[in-house]
């Protein structure tokens, strides 16, 4: 079976346009309900969380209707981070978890992703089976077996308490001034409260969601305001989350950014010294910088690369039994603590390193020199396949010859947007620019 509706991170699109319509969400809920509750089975429960997008109300109600129509009992969590849904699915012994979010995308977009009873995102195979059910006639429950829906008030609080248990026992953040940018998203209450309860002086940004300002000039994809706040307040560190708080970017005391590669390098080195890094292996995607690979190799550590997408990082970690992975974009996966990327937990681990070592954020967030990397995105029209054009393939082959032995080239379609991502790494920056610009021009001509 193949997946057409699901991308690399669930179903995603523009709100009120296919597939992010109330009609599709209702049927998707019913299909998921029938997948997790075969005809004649008991009354499983599902938890539903969402971020702060205006369209979340519509999709939450539609999903609830579809799920209850097949006999699923629904527990509504309200706005919570994506990793909270994974945690609460397990903690509340639910059979299914659902998160309504388009992560770092603007408010006009939204998405739906599913978690299994173990708190991990569903496999490609499970999503394909749900699509197959969706394509057919979905049998509803008998009138006496229709599910119920109930709003849960303490879901966020349960997650916050769990977050604090991952912080080293007896350690506090007294004396640390922390800027936290919540992107007007799902962690707008949880993140500042956890930091304050651990003793930090908290300067919160992006904590006034209005349904339309999620990720708007704030958060991990737009950290400029947080960087300015770090400098203006003389803060020790900045933590920037995205709209659903599953990714993080760290800012040092000068407001300079540290991406997921630098964060993973710090954690891998510390965990290896402490004997916590399983099989001396870090899992990251093909997008991670060559400098990270060199840093790990110099310390006798191994980098296992996967396709782009935190779900593929997690799948590789589970297959190999490894416990640390992530993406350059800021998804940091620590399976000792969570089933998916968790920006708040990663931020807490960085703060713990600061508190335990007494070192500045700038000293901890620059583990290696990055190899110059250039990434450009090219938007294309629906139905087009520019990468199959002979002219594009010829330019790519020529670029590979020019980079041979001196760098890396990666060209791929986005799994969540109609974009071609062109990425190259090379010590020779002039060659790097030439190669990327030539490929981008060819893709634009073919798109």
Swiss-Prot record:
Keywords: Isomerase, Magnesium, Metal-binding, Phosphoprotein. Transmembrane segments: none annotated. It is an enzyme of class 5 (isomerase). One of its GO terms (biological process) is peptidoglycan biosynthetic process. The modification Phosphoserine is found at residue 103. InterPro entries: A-D-PHexomutase_a/b/a-I (IPR005844), A-D-PHexomutase_a/b/a-I/II/III (IPR016055), A-D-PHexomutase_a/b/a-II (IPR005845), A-D-PHexomutase_a/b/a-III (IPR005846), A-D-PHexomutase_C (IPR005843), A-D-PHexomutase_C_sf (IPR036900), A-D-PHexomutase_CS (IPR016066), Alpha-D-phosphohexomutase_SF (IPR005841). Pfam families: PGM_PMM_I (PF02878), PGM_PMM_II (PF02879), PGM_PMM_III (PF02880), PGM_PMM_IV (PF00408). GO terms for cellular component: cytosol. It comes from the Bacteria. GO terms for molecular function: magnesium ion binding; phosphoglucosamine mutase activity; phosphomannomutase activity. Binds 1 Mg(2+) ion per subunit. The active site is at residue 103. SUPFAM superfamilies: Phosphoglucomutase, C-terminal domain (SSF55957), Phosphoglucomutase, first 3 domains (SSF53738). Gene3D superfamilies: Alpha-D-Glucose-1,6-Bisphosphate, subunit A, domain 3, Alpha-D-phosphohexomutase, C-terminal domain. It catalyses: alpha-D-glucosamine 1-phosphate = D-glucosamine 6-phosphate. Activated by phosphorylation. CDD domains: GlmM (cd05802). Belongs to the phosphohexose mutase family. This is Phosphoglucosamine mutase. It comes from Cereibacter sphaeroides (strain ATCC 17025 / ATH 2.4.3) (Rhodobacter sphaeroides).
């Amino acid at each position: 079976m193949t997946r057409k509706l699901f991308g690399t991170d669930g179903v995603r699109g523009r709100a009120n346009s296919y597939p992010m319509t109330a009609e599709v969400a209702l049927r998707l809920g019913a299909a998921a309900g029938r997948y997790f509750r075969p005809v004649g089975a008991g009354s499983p429960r599902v938890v539903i969380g969402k971020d702060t997008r205006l369209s979340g109300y519509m999709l939450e109600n539609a999903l609830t209707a579809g799920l209850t129509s097949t006999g699923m009992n629904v527990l509504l969590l309200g706005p919570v981070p994506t990793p909270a849904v994974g945690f609460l699915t397990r903690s509340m012994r639910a059979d299914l978890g659902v998160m309504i979010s388009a992560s770092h995308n603007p408010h006009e977009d939204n998405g739906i992703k599913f978690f299994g009873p173990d708190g991990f995102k569903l496999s490609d195979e499970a999503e394909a089976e749900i699509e197959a059910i969706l394509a057919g006639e979905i049998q509803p429950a008998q009138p006496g077996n229709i599910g119920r829906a109930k709003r849960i008030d303490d879901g966020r609080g349960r997650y916050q308490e769990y977050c604090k248990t991952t912080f080293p026992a007896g350690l506090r953040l007294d004396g640390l001034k922390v800027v936290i940018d919540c992107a007007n998203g799902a962690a707008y209450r949880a993140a500042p409260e956890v930091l304050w309860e651990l003793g930090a002086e908290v300067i919160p940004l992006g904590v006034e969601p209005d349904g339309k300002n999620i990720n708007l000039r704030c958060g991990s994809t737009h950290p400029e305001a947080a960087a300015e706040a770090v400098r203006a307040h003389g803060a020790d560190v900045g933590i920037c989350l995205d709209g659903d708080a599953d990714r993080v970017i760290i800012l040092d005391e000068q407001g300079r950014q540290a991406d997921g590669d630098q964060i993973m390098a710090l954690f891998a080195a510390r965990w290896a010294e402490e004997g916590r890094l399983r099989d001396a292996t870090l899992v990251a995607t093909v997008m991670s910088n060559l400098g990270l690979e060199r840093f790990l190799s110099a310390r006798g550590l191994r980098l296992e690369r996967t396709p782009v997408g935190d779900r593929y990082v997690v799948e590789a970690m589970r297959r190999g039994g490894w416990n640390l992975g992530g993406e350059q974009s800021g998804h940091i996966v620590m399976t000792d603590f969570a089933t998916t990327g968790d920006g708040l937990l990663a931020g807490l681990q960085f703060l713990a390193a600061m508190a335990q070592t007494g070192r500045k954020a700038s000293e901890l967030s620059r583990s290696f020199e990055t190899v110059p990397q250039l990434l450009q995105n090219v938007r294309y029209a629906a139905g087009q396949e520019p990468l199959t054009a002979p002219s594009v393939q010829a330019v790519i082959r020529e670029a590979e010859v020019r980079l041979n032995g001196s760098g890396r080239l990666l060209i791929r379609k986005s799994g969540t947007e109609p974009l071609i991502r062109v990425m190259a790494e090379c010590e020779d920056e002039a060659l790097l620019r030439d190669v990327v610009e030539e490929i981008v021009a060819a893709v634009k001509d073919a798109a």
